[in-house]
Protein backbone atom coordinates (compact mmCIF):
# COMPACT_ATOMS: atom_id res chain seq x y z
CA UNK A 1 0.00 0.00 0.00
CA UNK A 2 1.34 3.44 -0.92
CA UNK A 3 2.02 5.79 1.95
CA UNK A 4 -0.33 8.75 2.07
CA UNK A 5 1.72 11.83 1.11
CA UNK A 6 0.06 13.93 3.81
CA UNK A 7 1.15 11.57 6.61
CA UNK A 8 3.72 13.31 8.81
CA UNK A 9 5.26 11.06 11.49
CA UNK A 10 7.01 14.00 13.17
CA UNK A 11 3.64 15.13 14.52
CA UNK A 12 3.56 12.08 16.76
CA UNK A 13 0.98 9.80 15.12
CA UNK A 14 1.71 6.24 13.98
CA UNK A 15 0.87 5.33 10.39
CA UNK A 16 -1.43 2.51 11.52
CA UNK A 17 -3.37 4.91 13.71
CA UNK A 18 -3.52 7.54 10.98
CA UNK A 19 -5.05 5.09 8.46
CA UNK A 20 -7.55 3.86 11.04
CA UNK A 21 -8.59 7.44 11.63
CA UNK A 22 -9.15 8.03 7.92
CA UNK A 23 -11.31 4.92 7.63
CA UNK A 24 -13.39 5.86 10.64
CA UNK A 25 -13.95 9.39 9.40
CA UNK A 26 -15.20 7.99 6.10
CA UNK A 27 -17.61 5.54 7.67
CA UNK A 28 -18.86 7.45 10.72
CA UNK A 29 -17.76 11.04 10.35
CA UNK A 30 -16.23 10.78 13.82
CA UNK A 31 -13.08 9.47 15.43
CA UNK A 32 -13.67 8.65 19.09
CA UNK A 33 -10.36 7.06 19.89
CA UNK A 34 -11.28 6.05 23.43
CA UNK A 35 -14.05 3.84 21.97
CA UNK A 36 -11.71 2.09 19.52
CA UNK A 37 -8.97 0.73 21.75
CA UNK A 38 -8.82 -0.39 25.33
CA UNK A 39 -5.22 0.79 25.09
CA UNK A 40 -3.48 2.75 22.36
CA UNK A 41 0.15 2.59 21.28
CA UNK A 42 1.39 5.98 20.13
CA UNK A 43 4.64 7.39 18.83
CA UNK A 44 5.64 10.65 20.44
CA UNK A 45 7.22 13.63 18.71
CA UNK A 46 10.49 12.60 20.35
CA UNK A 47 10.36 9.13 18.80
CA UNK A 48 9.54 7.17 21.97
CA UNK A 49 6.59 4.78 22.34
CA UNK A 50 3.98 4.98 25.06
CA UNK A 51 0.62 3.44 25.84
CA UNK A 52 -2.47 5.46 26.73
CA UNK A 53 -4.94 3.73 29.02
CA UNK A 54 -8.66 4.44 28.68
CA UNK A 55 -10.22 7.08 30.93
CA UNK A 56 -13.83 7.72 31.96
CA UNK A 57 -15.84 9.58 29.34
CA UNK A 58 -16.19 12.49 31.78
CA UNK A 59 -12.99 13.82 33.47
CA UNK A 60 -12.45 12.67 37.04
CA UNK A 61 -13.43 14.98 39.87
CA UNK A 62 -10.72 16.63 41.93
CA UNK A 63 -7.96 19.18 41.40
CA UNK A 64 -6.39 19.47 37.95
CA UNK A 65 -3.22 21.47 37.39
CA UNK A 66 -2.67 23.55 34.21
CA UNK A 67 1.08 23.05 34.15
CA UNK A 68 3.49 25.89 33.34
CA UNK A 69 6.17 25.61 30.65
CA UNK A 70 9.96 25.59 31.00
CA UNK A 71 12.11 27.25 28.31
CA UNK A 72 15.79 27.43 27.36
CA UNK A 73 15.81 31.19 26.90
CA UNK A 74 19.22 31.29 25.24
CA UNK A 75 17.84 29.24 22.34
CA UNK A 76 14.14 30.12 22.79
CA UNK A 77 13.28 26.42 22.90
CA UNK A 78 11.41 24.08 25.24
CA UNK A 79 13.34 22.69 28.21
CA UNK A 80 11.87 19.21 27.92
CA UNK A 81 14.19 17.62 30.50
CA UNK A 82 12.95 19.94 33.25
CA UNK A 83 9.42 19.70 31.89
CA UNK A 84 9.46 15.91 32.17
CA UNK A 85 10.62 16.04 35.80
CA UNK A 86 7.94 18.58 36.60
CA UNK A 87 5.13 16.59 35.00
CA UNK A 88 6.26 13.42 36.78
CA UNK A 89 6.38 15.20 40.13
CA UNK A 90 2.93 16.76 39.77
CA UNK A 91 1.41 13.40 38.86
CA UNK A 92 2.42 12.02 42.28
CA UNK A 93 0.99 14.80 44.47
CA UNK A 94 -2.66 13.77 44.68
CA UNK A 95 -3.91 15.71 41.67
CA UNK A 96 -6.75 14.28 39.57
CA UNK A 97 -5.00 15.15 36.31
CA UNK A 98 -2.84 17.61 34.40
CA UNK A 99 -3.85 20.16 31.81
CA UNK A 100 -1.18 20.57 29.16
CA UNK A 101 -1.37 23.73 27.03
CA UNK A 102 -3.71 25.65 29.28
CA UNK A 103 -3.46 29.41 29.62
CA UNK A 104 -0.62 29.11 32.15
CA UNK A 105 1.44 27.04 29.70
CA UNK A 106 1.63 30.08 27.37
CA UNK A 107 0.09 27.87 24.68
CA UNK A 108 -0.53 30.73 22.27
CA UNK A 109 3.21 31.46 22.30
CA UNK A 110 4.07 27.91 21.17
CA UNK A 111 4.38 26.47 17.69
CA UNK A 112 2.16 23.58 16.62
CA UNK A 113 5.12 21.21 16.87
CA UNK A 114 5.98 22.47 20.37
CA UNK A 115 2.41 21.88 21.50
CA UNK A 116 2.62 18.25 20.41
CA UNK A 117 6.02 17.89 22.06
CA UNK A 118 4.68 19.08 25.40
CA UNK A 119 1.79 16.61 25.35
CA UNK A 120 3.96 13.66 24.32
CA UNK A 121 6.55 14.64 26.95
CA UNK A 122 3.82 14.71 29.57
CA UNK A 123 2.48 11.32 28.54
CA UNK A 124 5.95 9.76 28.67
CA UNK A 125 6.59 11.35 32.08
CA UNK A 126 3.35 10.39 33.82
CA UNK A 127 2.79 6.97 32.26
CA UNK A 128 -0.24 5.52 30.49
CA UNK A 129 -2.79 5.77 33.31
CA UNK A 130 -2.61 9.37 34.52
CA UNK A 131 -5.26 11.65 32.95
CA UNK A 132 -4.14 14.42 30.60
CA UNK A 133 -6.28 17.21 29.21
CA UNK A 134 -4.85 19.25 26.33
CA UNK A 135 -5.68 22.85 25.49
CA UNK A 136 -6.43 23.25 21.78
CA UNK A 137 -7.59 26.85 21.67
CA UNK A 138 -7.27 28.54 18.27
CA UNK A 139 -8.96 31.17 16.12
CA UNK A 140 -10.93 28.93 13.75
CA UNK A 141 -12.76 25.60 13.74
CA UNK A 142 -10.21 24.11 11.32
CA UNK A 143 -7.22 25.16 13.44
CA UNK A 144 -8.85 23.80 16.59
CA UNK A 145 -9.58 20.44 14.97
CA UNK A 146 -6.02 20.16 13.66
CA UNK A 147 -4.70 20.74 17.18
CA UNK A 148 -7.25 18.24 18.50
CA UNK A 149 -5.92 15.53 16.18
CA UNK A 150 -2.36 16.39 17.25
CA UNK A 151 -3.34 16.16 20.92
CA UNK A 152 -4.98 12.76 20.48
CA UNK A 153 -1.93 11.46 18.63
CA UNK A 154 0.41 12.73 21.35
CA UNK A 155 -1.44 10.97 24.15
CA UNK A 156 -4.09 13.31 25.58
CA UNK A 157 -7.36 11.98 27.02
CA UNK A 158 -9.50 15.13 26.89
CA UNK A 159 -9.52 18.51 25.15
CA UNK A 160 -9.91 21.95 26.76
CA UNK A 161 -11.38 24.32 24.19
CA UNK A 162 -11.67 28.11 24.31
CA UNK A 163 -14.20 29.85 22.06
CA UNK A 164 -12.65 31.62 19.06
CA UNK A 165 -12.68 35.26 20.08
CA UNK A 166 -10.04 37.20 18.15
CA UNK A 167 -12.90 39.10 16.50
CA UNK A 168 -14.57 39.81 19.81
CA UNK A 169 -17.56 41.85 18.67
CA UNK A 170 -18.38 39.31 15.96
CA UNK A 171 -18.23 36.41 18.41
CA UNK A 172 -21.84 36.29 19.53
CA UNK A 173 -23.42 33.28 21.24
CA UNK A 174 -24.67 31.86 17.93
CA UNK A 175 -21.08 31.82 16.66
CA UNK A 176 -19.92 30.20 19.90
CA UNK A 177 -22.60 27.49 19.71
CA UNK A 178 -21.83 26.75 16.06
CA UNK A 179 -18.12 26.50 16.82
CA UNK A 180 -18.52 24.04 19.68
CA UNK A 181 -21.09 22.01 17.76
CA UNK A 182 -18.67 21.52 14.87
CA UNK A 183 -15.67 20.86 17.10
CA UNK A 184 -17.49 18.36 19.31
CA UNK A 185 -18.93 16.50 16.32
CA UNK A 186 -15.51 15.99 14.74
CA UNK A 187 -13.23 15.84 17.78
CA UNK A 188 -11.24 12.65 18.40
CA UNK A 189 -11.52 13.21 22.18
CA UNK A 190 -14.15 14.42 24.67
CA UNK A 191 -14.38 18.21 24.89
CA UNK A 192 -14.28 20.42 27.99
CA UNK A 193 -15.54 23.94 27.27
CA UNK A 194 -13.26 26.70 28.58
CA UNK A 195 -14.91 29.96 29.61
CA UNK A 196 -12.28 32.65 30.27
CA UNK A 197 -13.47 36.14 29.24
CA UNK A 198 -10.12 37.65 30.26
CA UNK A 199 -8.30 36.02 27.33
CA UNK A 200 -11.25 35.98 24.91
CA UNK A 201 -11.97 39.65 24.24
CA UNK A 202 -14.62 39.61 26.95
CA UNK A 203 -16.60 36.75 25.39
CA UNK A 204 -18.40 35.25 28.39
CA UNK A 205 -20.65 32.22 27.99
CA UNK A 206 -23.63 32.09 30.32
CA UNK A 207 -24.81 28.83 31.86
CA UNK A 208 -27.69 28.53 29.38
CA UNK A 209 -25.28 28.69 26.43
CA UNK A 210 -22.96 26.12 27.99
CA UNK A 211 -25.88 23.78 28.68
CA UNK A 212 -27.14 24.20 25.11
CA UNK A 213 -23.69 23.32 23.75
CA UNK A 214 -23.59 20.14 25.83
CA UNK A 215 -27.12 19.13 24.77
CA UNK A 216 -26.72 19.91 21.07
CA UNK A 217 -27.66 16.75 19.11
CA UNK A 218 -24.75 17.44 16.76
CA UNK A 219 -22.39 16.95 19.73
CA UNK A 220 -23.77 13.49 20.48
CA UNK A 221 -21.42 10.63 19.72
CA UNK A 222 -22.43 7.33 18.17
CA UNK A 223 -22.55 5.79 21.67
CA UNK A 224 -25.41 8.15 22.56
CA UNK A 225 -23.38 10.35 24.89
CA UNK A 226 -22.49 13.98 24.33
CA UNK A 227 -18.91 14.62 23.30
CA UNK A 228 -19.06 17.81 25.42
CA UNK A 229 -18.23 16.47 28.87
CA UNK A 230 -17.49 19.48 31.05
CA UNK A 231 -16.57 23.10 31.50
CA UNK A 232 -13.84 25.13 33.16
CA UNK A 233 -15.22 28.39 34.55
CA UNK A 234 -12.38 30.87 34.91
CA UNK A 235 -15.04 33.57 34.93
CA UNK A 236 -15.27 32.72 38.64
CA UNK A 237 -19.06 32.40 38.74
CA UNK A 238 -20.32 30.10 41.49
CA UNK A 239 -23.80 30.89 40.18
CA UNK A 240 -22.94 29.19 36.88
CA UNK A 241 -21.59 26.20 38.79
CA UNK A 242 -24.87 25.97 40.70
CA UNK A 243 -27.04 26.14 37.58
CA UNK A 244 -24.95 23.64 35.63
CA UNK A 245 -24.83 21.24 38.57
CA UNK A 246 -28.61 21.46 38.70
CA UNK A 247 -28.84 20.74 34.97
CA UNK A 248 -26.52 17.74 34.57
CA UNK A 249 -25.72 14.57 36.46
CA UNK A 250 -22.04 14.49 37.53
CA UNK A 251 -21.46 11.29 35.55
CA UNK A 252 -22.50 13.15 32.37
CA UNK A 253 -20.89 16.57 32.81
CA UNK A 254 -18.10 17.92 35.03
CA UNK A 255 -18.16 21.57 36.08
CA UNK A 256 -14.75 22.83 37.24
CA UNK A 257 -13.96 26.14 38.87
CA UNK A 258 -11.09 28.02 37.27
CA UNK A 259 -9.32 29.07 40.47
CA UNK A 260 -8.67 27.30 43.74
CA UNK A 261 -9.61 30.16 46.06
CA UNK A 262 -13.31 29.31 45.69
CA UNK A 263 -12.80 25.53 45.59
CA UNK A 264 -14.98 24.83 48.64
CA UNK A 265 -17.63 27.30 47.52
CA UNK A 266 -17.72 25.54 44.18
CA UNK A 267 -17.89 22.09 45.74
CA UNK A 268 -20.77 23.19 47.95
CA UNK A 269 -22.59 24.35 44.81
CA UNK A 270 -21.96 21.05 43.02
CA UNK A 271 -18.67 21.47 41.16
CA UNK A 272 -16.39 18.57 40.24
CA UNK A 273 -13.40 20.44 41.66
CA UNK A 274 -11.10 22.96 40.03
CA UNK A 275 -8.52 23.46 37.31
CA UNK A 276 -6.29 25.95 39.05
CA UNK A 277 -2.93 27.63 38.43
CA UNK A 278 -2.25 27.62 42.18
CA UNK A 279 -1.89 23.83 41.97
CA UNK A 280 1.37 24.44 40.08
CA UNK A 281 2.84 25.95 43.23
CA UNK A 282 1.26 23.90 46.02
CA UNK A 283 -0.35 20.82 44.45
CA UNK A 284 -0.50 18.81 47.67
CA UNK A 285 -2.20 21.59 49.61
CA UNK A 286 -4.79 22.16 46.88
CA UNK A 287 -5.52 18.44 46.57
CA UNK A 288 -5.70 18.20 50.36
CA UNK A 289 -8.45 20.83 50.53
CA UNK A 290 -10.51 18.80 48.07
CA UNK A 291 -9.86 15.53 49.92
CA UNK A 292 -10.78 16.99 53.32
CA UNK A 293 -14.04 18.36 51.98
CA UNK A 294 -14.93 15.04 50.37
CA UNK A 295 -14.30 13.27 53.69
CA UNK A 296 -16.69 15.63 55.46
CA UNK A 297 -13.92 17.39 57.40
CA UNK A 298 -15.37 20.76 56.49
CA UNK A 299 -13.82 22.92 59.21
CA UNK A 300 -10.33 21.57 58.53
CA UNK A 301 -10.86 22.04 54.80
CA UNK A 302 -12.03 25.63 55.33
CA UNK A 303 -9.06 26.46 57.54
CA UNK A 304 -6.64 25.25 54.88
CA UNK A 305 -8.67 26.93 52.11
CA UNK A 306 -8.39 30.31 53.85
CA UNK A 307 -4.63 30.01 54.19
CA UNK A 308 -4.28 28.90 50.58
CA UNK A 309 -6.50 31.73 49.32
CA UNK A 310 -4.29 34.31 51.04
CA UNK A 311 -1.19 32.69 49.54
CA UNK A 312 -2.79 32.59 46.10
CA UNK A 313 -3.34 36.36 46.18
CA UNK A 314 0.38 36.83 45.51
CA UNK A 315 0.15 35.23 42.06
CA UNK A 316 -3.15 36.69 40.89
CA UNK A 317 -1.29 39.16 38.67
CA UNK A 318 -0.60 36.53 36.03
CA UNK A 319 1.60 33.85 34.54
CA UNK A 320 4.94 35.48 35.38
CA UNK A 321 4.19 35.55 39.11
CA UNK A 322 2.91 31.96 39.04
CA UNK A 323 6.07 30.77 37.29
CA UNK A 324 8.29 32.55 39.80
CA UNK A 325 6.41 30.87 42.65
CA UNK A 326 6.89 27.50 40.94
CA UNK A 327 10.63 28.21 40.77
CA UNK A 328 10.66 28.97 44.50
CA UNK A 329 8.67 25.95 45.63
CA UNK A 330 7.35 23.05 43.53
CA UNK A 331 10.21 23.01 41.01
CA UNK A 332 12.65 22.56 43.88
CA UNK A 333 10.59 19.73 45.34
CA UNK A 334 10.60 18.17 41.86
CA UNK A 335 14.41 18.19 41.91
CA UNK A 336 14.80 20.68 39.06
CA UNK A 337 18.07 22.57 39.31
CA UNK A 338 18.28 26.24 38.29
CA UNK A 339 14.56 26.40 37.61
CA UNK A 340 14.29 30.17 38.00
CA UNK A 341 16.18 30.83 34.78
CA UNK A 342 14.00 28.51 32.74
CA UNK A 343 10.69 29.64 34.22
CA UNK A 344 10.70 33.19 32.94
CA UNK A 345 7.85 33.82 30.48
CA UNK A 346 8.57 33.37 26.80
CA UNK A 347 9.65 36.49 24.97
CA UNK A 348 8.49 39.16 24.56
CA UNK A 349 6.91 38.89 28.03
CA UNK A 350 8.80 39.84 31.18
CA UNK A 351 9.52 38.39 34.59
CA UNK A 352 8.01 39.90 37.71
CA UNK A 353 10.05 42.60 39.44
CA UNK A 354 12.17 42.11 42.54
CA UNK A 355 9.55 43.68 44.78
CA UNK A 356 6.91 41.22 43.61
CA UNK A 357 9.31 38.33 44.15
CA UNK A 358 9.79 39.36 47.78
CA UNK A 359 6.02 39.58 48.30
CA UNK A 360 5.50 36.13 46.78
CA UNK A 361 7.97 34.55 49.19
CA UNK A 362 6.54 36.40 52.20
CA UNK A 363 2.88 35.70 51.47
CA UNK A 364 3.45 32.05 50.58
CA UNK A 365 5.82 31.12 53.40
CA UNK A 366 3.24 29.51 55.72
CA UNK A 367 1.58 27.42 53.01
CA UNK A 368 5.02 26.40 51.71
CA UNK A 369 5.74 24.78 55.06
CA UNK A 370 2.39 22.99 55.00
CA UNK A 371 3.14 21.70 51.49
CA UNK A 372 6.46 20.26 52.67
CA UNK A 373 4.73 18.48 55.54
CA UNK A 374 2.21 16.65 53.33
Role assignments for model-derived ranges:
Residues 49, 54-65, 69-202:
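Active-site beta->alpha loop and helix N-cap motifs at the rims of alpha/beta catalytic domains
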Residues 20-24, 30:
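Leucine-biased recognition of intrinsically disordered, low-complexity hydrophobic segments
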Residues 7, 15-18, 37:
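Aromatic (phenylalanine/tyrosine) cluster motif
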Residues 197-307, 315:
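Catalytic alpha/beta core domains of metabolic enzymes, predominantly
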Residues 264-374:
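Structured C-terminal cap/extension of enzyme domains
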Residues 124-130, 154-155, 187-189, 216-226, ...:
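Short helix-capping segments at alpha-helix termini
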Amino acid sequence: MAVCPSFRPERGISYKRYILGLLLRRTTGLVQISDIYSTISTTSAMGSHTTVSPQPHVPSSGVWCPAVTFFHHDTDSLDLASQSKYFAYLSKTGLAGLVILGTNSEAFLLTREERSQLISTARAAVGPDFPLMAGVGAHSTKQTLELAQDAAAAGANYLLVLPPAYFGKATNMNVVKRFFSEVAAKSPLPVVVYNFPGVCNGVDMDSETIAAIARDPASTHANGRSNVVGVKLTCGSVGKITRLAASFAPEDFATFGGQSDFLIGGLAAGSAGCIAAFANVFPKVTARIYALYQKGQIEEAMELQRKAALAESAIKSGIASTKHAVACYSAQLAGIQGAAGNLAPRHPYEEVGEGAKIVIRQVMAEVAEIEKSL
